[in-house]
Every structure is written in structure tokens, then in C-alpha cells.
């Protein structure tokens, strides 16, 4: 539901995945701030990243929940990956899209994992 300020309320994983895919096509830069990254073999959400020029990932590794394959995939794709020290519980779920035309922010409870999408 869109209001006058451009805020959209997303109430399901399906809506979140659809909006994430749309924004990956509309914008050219994405900053991901997430507690965990999943296995790239699950395709979603990794397939959407192909539409972007640049991707920065700020990733938590607490509780050994991030997939080593997912981390390696991001590194192999030459995305900027910053792993946050696991001495602290790093638990954001923010997706910040930017381009010359504007910006958008998705936030909520979805980690960058198949289950989150």
C-alpha cells in the first residue's frame, strides 16, 4: 500500500521478493546490511543481483548461520563484502538501493537467504 510519502507496506515474503526484484531492475547500486547470507544454489535472491552495476554487502556471521558458499559467491562476483566481527550480534536487514534518479530502502525481517525471501 503506497501513501503520499512513497512508503509501501509489504506484508508477505512473496511481496518482499517481488519488490526486491523490481528495485534491482530499477536501480543500479545496492547496499545490503544483513545478519546472514544463504546458499546461492537456491537462486533467489542471488539471481536479482545480476541486474545491478555495484553491490556492497555488510554481513554478519554470528551463530554460524551465513553460508560459506554464499559468502564465496559474493566475493567471486567481485562485490564489496565486509564481514562484521562476530563478537557482536550484527542483525540488520536493510537493502538500500541508489541510482542517479533516486533511492529506495527495504527494511524488515528478511535476511539475504532463500527463507528470507
Place the predicted regions along the sequence by residue.
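PLD/PLD-like phosphodiesterase catalytic module centered on the HKD motif
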Residues: 1-117
Amino acid at each position: 500500500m503506497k501513501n503520499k510519502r512513497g512508503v509501501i507496506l509489504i506484508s508477505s515474503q512473496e511481496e518482499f521478493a517481488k519488490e526486491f526484484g523490481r528495485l534491482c531492475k530499477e536501480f543500479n547500486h545496492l547496499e545490503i546490511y544483513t545478519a546472514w547470507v544463504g546458499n546461492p544454489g537456491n537462486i533467489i535472491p542471488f539471481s536479482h543481483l545480476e541486474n545491478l552495476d555495484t553491490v556492497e554487502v555488510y554481513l554478519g556471521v554470528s551463530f554460524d548461520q551465513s553460508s560459506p558458499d554464499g559468502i564465496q559467491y559474493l566475493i567471486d562476483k567481485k562485490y564489496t563484502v565486509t564481514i562484521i566481527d562476530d563478537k557482536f550480534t550484527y542483525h540488520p536487514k536493510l537493502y538500500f538501493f541508489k541510482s542517479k534518479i533516486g533511492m529506495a530502502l527495504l527494511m524488515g525481517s528478511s535476511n539475504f537467504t532463500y527463507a528470507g525471501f
